[in-house]
UniProtKB/Swiss-Prot annotation:
One of its GO terms (molecular function) is 4 iron, 4 sulfur cluster binding. The lineage of its organism: Archaea, Methanobacteriati, Thermoplasmatota, Thermoplasmata, Thermoplasmatales. Signal peptide: none annotated. Ferredoxins are iron-sulfur proteins that transfer electrons in a wide variety of metabolic reactions. [4Fe-4S] cluster 1 binds at C17, C20, C23, C56. Residues 8-36, 37-66 form the 4Fe-4S ferredoxin-type domain. It comes from Thermoplasma acidophilum (strain ATCC 25905 / DSM 1728 / JCM 9062 / NBRC 15155 / AMRC-C165). The keyword Repeat applies. This is Probable ferredoxin TA0517. The keyword Iron-sulfur applies. Its cofactor is [4Fe-4S] cluster. [4Fe-4S] cluster 2 binds at C27, C46, C49, C52. It comes from the Archaea. Keywords: 4Fe-4S, Electron transport, Iron, Iron-sulfur, Metal-binding, Repeat, Transport.
C-alpha cells in the first residue's frame, strides 16, 4: 500500500511579517513571491523544505507539517 502525503496550508501572520522578502529568496522552487504587501505561496510548487519558515527573521510563516527539523 502506498501512503500519500497530504499537504496542509501554510500561514503568514501579517502582524509579524515585515515584507522583507527573505522567504522569497530562500525558496528553491519559487513557490513564494511578494505581491506588494502580501506574501503569496503557491502550495502546489511547495516541496515542504521549511527553508522559508527557518529563514523568516520575524517567525511570520508557519505550517502544520513543520516541526523545526530540516
Amino acid at each position: 500500500m502506498v501512503e500519500l502525503k497530504v499537504k496542509t496550508e501554510m500561514d503568514v501572520d501579517r502582524n509579524l511579517c515585515n515584507y522583507c522578502g527573505a522567504c522569497v529568496g530562500m525558496c528553491p522552487t519559487d513557490a513564494i513571491w511578494l505581491d506588494e504587501t502580501v506574501i503569496k505561496i503557491h502550495e502546489e510548487k511547495c516541496i515542504e523544505c521549511g527553508f522559508c519558515i527557518v529563514g523568516c527573521p520575524t517567525g511570520a510563516i508557519t505550517a502544520e507539517w513543520f516541526h523545526g527539523n530540516l
